[in-house]
Amino acid sequence: MTWPFENDTSAITKKLAKRNLKADKSRNILIIITIALATCLIMTTTLYFFASQRKSLNDAAGRYQAIINEVDNDTITKLVNDSRVQVGVSHLLGLVSYGDYKLTVRSMDETLMKLAKYPDLEGELPKSTNEIAITKAFLDRAGLSKSVGDIISLNLGDGEKDYTLCGILPVENSNYSVFVSQSYIENKISEPAYSAYIRLNESDGWSKAAIQAELSTLCRELKIQPEQMQFSTYYFSLIEQRSSQYITVIAFISLIIALACTLVIYSLFYVS
């Protein structure tokens, strides 16, 4: 009942109530959106870091772990026959000038192709002294339109000669290399020294310390000097990206997101 001298405020009260309900509803929707976005950000960050770790481990799988330099034929034979390791062999013959850049001349075997994770070779590696394989980067830089089986004239340090192009390695990024056969190396050098690219068998999941200790033991057994062996910094940088490091980063980022989310919700409750 409303007395004659009283104002009827029921309509205003209803309007205020409706406005408050609408404001509460909007605020609740904003809170839900804020929490959902924060959850999505945390999940996206987590998935990104774990995907990065998986990519690194996949990239490391099968790669060579160390290089042993200045190795003679006898030691190469011992390494190749050792069941503990995979061994890729290469000999760097030298660098030759081609125009305004240098061309690397070296040998390489099939095992090294796998351990270095080179892309699939178009054709095959050279077997005879008159066969060579070349990187695509060199052909592109030199402006040579050549295919496997073509004859190519090059000066590899002993005058310009014709060679059969037996393989093209599809790598770019200024990798100007020519690969010659083992017989070519032996014709040029009586006692060539090789580089052995080695990897321990079944070592996926091993720690850096365990791998390096085992490889050092192998070298001692074969009387290889410590200074001859060089560990692959690229390989070990890949496997050292452990889950604990990622979890720490994820936890830190999640904390920042959670704090930001809390501030947004606080402002919605107390500022609006």
Language-model features, listed with the residues they occupy:
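Juxtamembrane/interface segments of multi-pass membrane proteins
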Residues: 4-7, 45, 236
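Charged, alpha-helix-enriched surfaces in structured cytosolic catalytic cores
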Residues: 8-16, 47, 160, 210, ...
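Hydrophobic alpha-helical transmembrane segments of multi-pass inner-membrane transport and secretion
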Residues: 25-53, 243-272
